[in-house]
């Protein structure tokens, strides 16, 4: 899986993280869809993902760190709209690590990583 293009890993990781956040918010909420959408956007935007990556960086495996490094340095030909380039690159690294673990089928690892984020950032 480490030979996959890091931007492909980020593409998958972004989708999985978005679904995870939406599921998390819906589980314990009676809010309407519009309100849930606004809350979810706070956690799937590049600024938030960059902060989440910094929370996870110290506990990443060597392989995850290499994937994050490759993703950060990949040229996506897309420029950020609502964040800095540095935040965008960290968000891409976060998404790539998520995508890597998702494609490996390592859902236990994803749960552990997401638990760290939820604990640190109080998602809800």
Functional labels for PLM-detected ranges:
Residues 1-124:
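Double-stranded RNA-binding/processing signature
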